[in-house]
Amino acid sequence: AAHIWVKVDNEEYYNWGELIRSINAKINEATSSADKQIGNWFVRVGKENTISLKKLVNKVLFYLWNDIYKDFDKDDDGYIFGNIENFESFFEPEASDDMGTELVDGINLKRVKDFIGALNDVHLYSKPSFDSRADLPEDKPEFETASSEE
């Protein structure tokens, strides 16, 4: 999973290994069940070891919303969706956004980034070097976080 990337856009990526570790910790807190956790191959990996943003939302976030957190109230401890009222809001522009929210493949990019940003130890990375991935240790991302390139 260390060499699998969730493609946010052409320049930004999340590391799949970081993402599932953080999500699985939240699932464990919510359910106390290892059976509900997601594995490395929960989502089919595409070209260049990437998972599209659309697949992440339609498969992973939908699973969390529909199967893990369906009985949670948004005020419950451990609820990970914050102020998100309904799952469809991942596909809609912000109601209060006069400038127009960026939709990528029909996905509200800001809402997804805000959701993932609230998870522990998940970083946004700049474009990876796919040619070098075979030489990396299993637990190390192959490029720097976007915030470290300032």
Which residue stretches match the model-derived regions?
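C-terminal regulatory/interaction module of P-loop NTP-utilizing enzymes
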Residues: A1-E150
